[in-house]
């Protein structure tokens, strides 16, 4: 079955779609990973937030990510977060498909992600490099990573 790729600005997100995205994120991050944290962080409906997801013909969300535009120090940068895939849909390239779609939109701008440590190799395949020390977020090791924009100096 081929999932449709959806991309929607926060302001255009309908209630059903938002519910399905949040439901999947809670399934993965809160239940599966046993991290009782507030998934609703206030950023899903910000004007500069875009949501990407894959959806089956019957409307089931199988994979999602959130792309946010930030302006750190006056510089436009993007941040990818909340990338997750439904347990029974893993291993089929869905995360890579969403990452490619989001990064196509990012274009030549820098993009950041706080990657779960075991996923750093996957993000490296998309041009991300380590950009700081490993840290714990809700008990899970994470690594800050950066995909430099054009003209940016890559870090080792």
Swiss-Prot record:
Record domain N-acetyltransferase: where: 8-150
Source taxon at top rank: Bacteria
InterPro entries documented for this protein: Acyl_CoA_acyltransferase (IPR016181), GNAT_dom (IPR000182)
Single GO MF descriptor: acyltransferase activity, transferring groups other than amino-acyl groups
Similarity comment: family membership: Belongs to the UPF0039 (ElaA) family.
Protein name (database record): UPF0039 protein Mb2876c
């Amino acid at each position: 079955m081929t999932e449709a790729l959806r991309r929607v600005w926060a302001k255009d997100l309908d209630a059903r779609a938002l519910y399905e995205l949040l439901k999947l994120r809670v399934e993965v991050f809160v239940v599966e990973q046993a991290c009782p944290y507030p998934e609703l962080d206030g950023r899903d409906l910000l004007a500069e937030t875009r949501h990407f997801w894959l959806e089956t013909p019957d409307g089931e969300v199988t994979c999602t990510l959130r792309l946010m535009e930030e302006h750190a120090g006056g510089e436009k940068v993007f941040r990818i977060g909340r990338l997750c895939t439904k347990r029974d849909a893993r291993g089929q390239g869905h995360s890579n498909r969403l990452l490619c779609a989001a990064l196509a939109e990012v274009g030549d701008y820098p993009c950041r992600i706080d990657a779960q440590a075991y996923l750093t190799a996957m993000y490296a395949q998309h041009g991300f490099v380590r950009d700081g020390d490993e840290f714990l977020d809700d008990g899970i090791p994470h690594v800050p990573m950066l995909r430099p924009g054009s003209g940016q100096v890559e870090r080792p």
